[in-house]
Design a protein with these regions (language model features):
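PRPP-associated nucleotide enzymes
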Residues: 1-272
Length: 272
């Protein structure tokens, strides 16, 4: 996240503050701001993940105690957003827990392409998207004549906005459970059409791989996928690489390297 933060402030010519970080032998985190920031306006940019949650909270606390005027917190990527409700008895709504912690900071917050807006009942935040920047990286000849697809019902609103901005038709992949199998159905003819799959994040990539396979079977031509956050867990890159997806375009909100199939777009100057 350090790279994104540093690059984000370069174009504004805003100085980033020096900090001292460390981990004690017993595993406790140490955080200290090494500059005088009393009465100075401050913007904090940080992802929220399992690995850095405590460091983030300590940085906010340190800034407050040092007398800074924290104007806002910008969160390019927030973990646990998929845990937005109780799906099975006894579960924690971990996304709600994280948002409740952020709420107690009492600082304006901006989050980019959060997976579930249901978390707004736990935290009031400004939601922004980076998807229009990513879709512009798709060749114009593809964008002019294609179908925009939401990989699941939860992404229809997200994909719909992209489709509307490009004046293109929107299609939702409908999933029907038959016994232990989940069958995917399309509500439009994709034969001879180029496809843009729109999603907020790619994690295992399983749904995207299955969708691409079915799209090709139904006669689709070029398949492009755009997603703000590229998690690419496990063997997802390998599986996506074997799929018929022409190009996957993601932002650099997470640390990921470009490859033959994956294009990583720098969004630093759009974050702040």
């Amino acid at each position: 996240m350090k790279y994104l933060l540093t690059e984000s402030v370069k174009h504004l010519k805003i100085p980033s503050i020096k900090v001292e970080k460390g981990v004690f032998s017993e595993g406790e985190i140490y955080f200290r701001i090494k500059e005088d920031i009393r009465n100075k306006p401050l913007i904090i940019i940080s992802n929220i993940t399992t690995d850095n949650l405590l460091e983030f909270l300590f940085s906010v606390d340190a800034a407050k105690r040092a007398g800074a005027k924290i104007k806002k917190i910008i969160i390019p990527f927030i973990s646990y957003a998929r845990q937005d409700k109780v799906y099975n008895y006894g579960e924690s709504v971990s996304g709600g827990v994280i948002c409740s912690i952020l709420k107690n900071l009492k600082i304006p917050i901006i989050i980019y392409d959060i997976h579930s807006k249901l978390l707004k009942k736990y935290l009031s935040f400004q939601h922004k998207t980076l998807l229009p920047i990513l879709v512009n990286k798709i060749p114009k000849k593809i964008r002019k004549d294609c179908i925009v697809i939401a990989p699941d019902s939860g992404g229809v609103e997200r994909a719909g906005k992209i489709a509307k901005s490009l004046n293109l038709p929107l299609m939702n992949i409908k999933k029907v459970r038959k016994g232990r199998k989940i069958i995917m159905n399309f509500d439009k003819d994709v034969s001879g059409k180029n496809i843009i799959i729109v999603d907020d994040m790619i994690s295992s990539g399983t749904t995207m791989v299955k969708a691409a396979k079915l799209l090709k079977k139904e006669g689709a031509k070029e398949i492009y996928a755009i997603s703000t956050h590229g998690l690419f867990v496990g063997n997802s890159k390998k599986e996506l690489g074997k799929s018929r997806i022409t190009k996957i375009i993601v932002s650099n909100t997470l640390s990921i390297k470009s490859s033959r199939q994956i294009e990583v777009v720098g969004v630093n100057k759009f974050i702040i």
